[in-house]
């Protein structure tokens, strides 16, 4: 059984459309876990009402109380499980609620963590299952992410991490979707699976553990991929698994203050944890980040960046939100 985790935060319409696309998958051996991450816009009720209004003969919707999430055992007819978190502790924490729920189900074989602002090709899951069934050493597998607004152009096939600067970029971003790849070559070239579509084996999750909740936002996928590789799990890419992602080609200029702070602070967090020998090159590179904020007239963000740089060691363990 495949458990698909979809995290919602103030994005009911996207979540509903994501679930609708999942209902068209050409396999039936899956269940969908929707975790509402303490939305402030009545998302949970909107999702529940819309899904209940859909006429889907064999798809039963069940609400599981947050306090019962680790005790509930799914029934055969349960298809969509709704869980509402009482607080928002970030992307990793919200997804971990769904992942833990799946791990408590004896019939779980794989967990597919999927962004709510995605829609999937009907064969996307079939290809992921086939890929991981054929190579048991794969712990985490990614899809070919395609721009939702331009389905001829891919967003990426995994990601690459620059250790010196702790910057990341999507592998083969901007290429035509029609381009053919050797997935084994890609798997060797990438450093992490993009968080919009991460397909985990049960063995990987049981060995490596859950997503690290310290980050709150950004770098969670790099962290868990580095931990998986340290435990000798492979990262896989399945270029035949198409997932359409609604994110724009560039969103950096639109980051909120909190998101910008997380992206800066977490560069130091993950570097200190996995690549301490590069800590000072990453630290120095943040002067360029601060300068760019000032150049754009974002002086509050510039001050936050400098504050993180000069107080990181002192405030280690503090939240970025």
Protein language model annotation of sequence segments:
Residues 1-24, 74:
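N-proximal low-complexity "stem/linker" segments adjacent to membrane-targeting elements
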Residues 10, 22, 37-42, 50, ...:
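Conserved short acidic donor-positioning loop in nucleotide-sugar-dependent glycosyltransferases
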Residues 20-29, 50-54:
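Short, acidic, metal-binding catalytic loop of nucleotide-sugar glycosyltransferases
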Residues 67-70, 77, 84-105:
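Glycine-rich, basic loop-to-helix element that forms the pyrophosphate-binding segment
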Residues 76, 84, 93, 119, ...:
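Acidic/His-rich active-site region of diverse nucleotide-sugar glycosyltransferases
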Residues 107-119:
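Short beta-strand-to-loop acidic/aromatic patch adjacent to the donor-nucleotide binding site
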Residues 186, 191-210, 214-242:
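A short, conserved alpha-helix in the catalytic core of glycosyltransferases
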Residues 258-266, 276-321:
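Non-catalytic, C-terminal membrane-associated alpha-helical segments of glycosyltransferases
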